[in-house]
């Protein structure tokens, strides 16, 4: 049956009614210039505008999906009309699928939620990404004849072949990929270089292998599953290899592929995390370390799902890194802004960009522990009750380089800051924290954007060389950023307590910055002193009974408290 297209004479809106696969009595779509109402579909209404078209597509059984397609912007919003069909995303990290036994446990965990029909996003098996990178670096200098003998290649092969055998699945699902991996390493050895583009293709083998193994295992235990490579189902990124940004065209492409496959042949989608495809080159790209979280939230937004679950090896987001301080405790609630700041300033639980799709789609993110699924975890939403806690977490970012840039020409000069930051833009270096005065700028550089020890030094030398053309530059290595995340609108009292703690430890704060989002305050200190600072701050902010006084003290007209907070030595 051909589709019928009707154009409304009062606007540019075009409406397409597609033939329905199961429901013959399709409701008439009452058209207005601003909204389209679906009275028989649980009173669902979708706003539209000029240049929009509305399509109603029915799925299998009683399930319906409504799609509002914005033709001009090439974006698509999808709303579930009833509770059946794909319901949530479950993302599992590398430690959660590090062995055959762990994969069995993850499969059992998924089956404990029979009411859910999830999309599963997987990382590479534990330590595989690191081994792939090491193998690539060794291949550059080992020679073609020795590429097959690289230790990390043998470790990768042994792990995946052993896992396949223990899960009792056909080894052919991975053998082709292991052979292709070996040939790639020989190619790197022949060329004697590992470009960013090749590096991304190399590390993609980790997720491609883990998802194929897990999908095959689910099928052997009677759970119908289908494997997907993210770069083949519509994950479109910039061509910034090793750190691609997901483009808006990803959302309708991913939604169409996953929903179309589900409607024709329902099966649990098993999707590679971390990967995409460059929009110009068509080459495999990666989303940066921890990018599987971003894959999960992108799918959640694309499909308009009710929840995104990120399963880790810790009981949710913690008040600090438990390897620094063992008395760290789970944070029950976070806002998207707080979670984004936590991730950006060093918390390893989430990818820095992963909150953006969830925030835009207003989809809750639940961080859970795959080793301890009964733990409540952390729920991340748009807002939370700010009266429940002042701070949510203390984050440490190590290996930070600090730059002091001073110039009397900066005083009253228009465009000086633009010149400084254009240098970083040209060199592709990200800046973390910035503080300015009349004649100087202090800033820190993001270490995650610097590749190796050799490149770090080369890039830093180049930065200093360029900056010295316009200012006096002092480069300070071995620094760390300590960030206090939470409701920092009470910043004066938080600073009072924090500085008292650092003063009693004899620590000199070299720089301080407060984010415009009002959810973080950051201090720069010597890295050697950083862990002790985190421990002392945690004791003061999370283990002191008088912290709640910050919330209940009467305030003066300027917002200041009537009395200062008593701090124990």
Swiss-Prot record:
> From the UniProt record, which GO molecular function terms apply?
aspartate kinase activity; ATP binding
Gene Ontology BP terms: amino acid biosynthetic process; lysine biosynthetic process via diaminopimelate; threonine biosynthetic process
List ligand-binding residues for S-adenosyl-L-methionine: 430, 452-453
Swiss-Prot/TrEMBL catalytic activity:
L-aspartate + ATP = 4-phospho-L-aspartate + ADP
PROSITE patterns, per this entry? ACT (PS51671), ASPARTOKINASE (PS00324)
Pfam families, per this entry? AA_kinase, ACT_9
Q: Which family does it belong to?
A: Belongs to the aspartokinase family.
What is the protein name for this chain?
Aspartokinase 1, chloroplastic
Tell me which species this is from.
Arabidopsis thaliana
Question: Organism classification, top ranks?
Answer: Eukaryota, Viridiplantae, Streptophyta, Embryophyta, Tracheophyta
